[in-house]
Amino acid sequence: MHTVIPHTHDTPAAAPVRSGAVAVVVGTGRSGTAAARLLHHLGASVRIVEKDESRVSAEFASLAARLGFDCRYGSHSAEQFAGADILVPSPGVPVASLLPYLDASRPPEIMAEIDLAARCVTSPVLAVTGTSGKTTTVSLCAAMLRAAGKRVFLGGNIGTPLSEYVLDVAAGEAPADVLVLEVSSFQLQTCTTLRPEVAVLINISANHLDYHADMQEYLDAKFRLFALQGPDDLAVLQSGMEELADRYALAARREFFDAVRRFPRTALLGSHNMANIEAAWLACRAFGVTQSQAAQAVEEFAPLEHRLEKVDEVAGVLFVNDSKSTTVDSMKAALESFDRPVLLLCGGKWKGGDLVSLIPVVRRHAKAVGLFGASREIFEHAWADVVPMSWDHDLQTAFRRMTAMAQPGDVVLMSPATSSYDLYSNYKERGGDFKRNVAAWKAERDD
């Protein structure tokens, strides 16, 4: 018999920040902007720190002037952080890089934007973290909860910062029945008050080792999601994490999931997505979602862009955009999703991982590998004797090389296992480039 999670946040924590406290926000992206607006709303004195003034949009500059933010641009210095009571680094800004500039005799309270906002909410929280599949899983959770008639806020590391939701509710918008939050290791590292009624860890493997000091620090950050849970809360974890759950002394009730095909009517590909669906179901039934409601949501759920996205099938060749694949494990899951020969496009800014462990999977599924961008030597060192490989400076040339080899029944799969920052601004831009190449190749064949 599963437990329906009670509504535990009757009132938000009193005085989330002290009125007049000096709050320093590092970064002016969407998360930093939302944190600054919320801090101002709560009565803090807001200071903005940004190393690169060219990143500051005209819209933010206008907001800062209107609300009276103290903006300090340029290379970090002790002066920028002097007198700070609160420090909110934007996701992706390593806290360690800021420590040399802080007053050790009077250190500020360091908190993530999502942690700040969590102090202000009354609705129960369903939070999801993991190395890969977070966005698909939280989107599935939102779909299942909505199928059950619940009002849902979906945000955090995906799309809308939680601070924007808090401000909208303060302005009169109806609160959500459930807050569904995607939470990254960057955010969790500075979370001290976030307590989800349901916390989900879908998987964990080497990632962001260009940010975290080592795998242990990354693991510690992920398990902070469960740190404040109590026995009335629910922790949902992948099977095989039982020992980790014991090591981190999880206090919540635990449920473990496998990649079972409980909901067979779905457009999602791969066993990893079956695991994502099962994790979402275990999380959502705690809020009263029935299996039939979940099944309806899964059947209607469209695969998300850049995540094993079927772009087109031309002359019997299937083109799949998995640009969001930035880890070795996500590439493995992508390759195992097909029983057809795969022409694999990969490469980019290396984030860590064990490519040698993929040799059996590459042998079984990959017909050829087309590398592009950075990390050439890392891939070649691991796979040079395993599969035919080529390397090109850019995706377009590598794409042309793979399509020249493609035959009916093949799959041209871009699953890079790396970040995109060597050639692109983000994974979405990389995925868009792949899709443009597919469209151009199709148009040439139609001529």
Curated annotation (Swiss-Prot):
Gene3D superfamilies tied to this protein: Mur ligase, C-terminal domain, Mur-like, catalytic domain, NAD(P)-binding Rossmann-like Domain
Chief subcellular location: cytoplasm
Highest taxon of source: Bacteria
Assigned GO CC terms: cytoplasm
Alphabetized UniProt keyword annotations: ATP-binding, Cell cycle, Cell division, Cell shape, Cell wall biogenesis/degradation, Cytoplasm, Ligase, Nucleotide-binding, Peptidoglycan synthesis
GO molecular function, one term: UDP-N-acetylmuramoylalanine-D-glutamate ligase activity
Biological processes, Gene Ontology terms: cell division; cell wall organization; peptidoglycan biosynthetic process; regulation of cell shape
Protein name: UDP-N-acetylmuramoylalanine--D-glutamate ligase
